[in-house]
UniProtKB/Swiss-Prot annotation:
Protein known as: UPF0306 protein YhbP
InterPro entries: Split_barrel_FMN-bd, UPF0306
Family as reported in the entry's similarity comment: Belongs to the UPF0306 family.
Highest taxon above the source species: Bacteria
SUPFAM superfamilies recorded: FMN-binding split barrel
């Protein structure tokens, strides 16, 4: 549990996620501001259905991605690599996520894009501030944590 707490604290301080989808052998990546839900271990994003990545995702799809800072030295590198699933939210689930998203990013109130959830199933957190190449791994299904 400590690994997930450490990762969640770091993710809560960031705000841009990159994720990639695949359809029929074609890959595409996208970036978006996110709201991280530590309880569900999920990102919430807004993206229009007409975008290439949303079209490739359909109502849900497997994804992989990253969240990282932009440090000037290797010793300060910190970042997450993940795999999981993206899905478009509907109804009350969408309304609740949008309310929380709009609270974090008030400018989003002007947007009508649908809300999507990226559920994280595996996370690898690299934190060179704890020593070069220091990794922490969290897996949803097994509850496994490695430091």
């Amino acid at each position: 549990m400590e690994t997930l707490i450490t990762i969640s604290r770091w993710l809560a301080k960031q705000h841009v996620v990159t994720w990639c989808v695949q359809q029929e052998g074609e890959l595409w990546c996208a970036n978006a501001f996110y709201l991280f839900d530590a309880q569900k271990v999920a990102f919430y994003i807004l993206t229009e259905e007409k975008t290439r990545h949303a079209q490739m995702s359909g109502p849900q799809a497997a994804v992989a991605g990253t969240v990282n800072g932009q440090p000037k030295t290797v010793a300060l590198i910190r970042g997450v690599q993940f795999k999981g699933e993206i899905r478009r939210l509907e109804g009350e689930e969408s309304d609740l996520a949008r309310k929380a998203y709009n609270h974090r990013f008030p400018v989003a109130r002007m947007l009508s894009a649908p809300v999507w959830e990226i559920r994280l199933d595996e996370i690898k957190f690299t934190d060179n501030t704890l020593g070069f190449g220091k990794k922490m791994i969290w897996l949803r299904d097994s509850g496994t944590e490695q430091a």
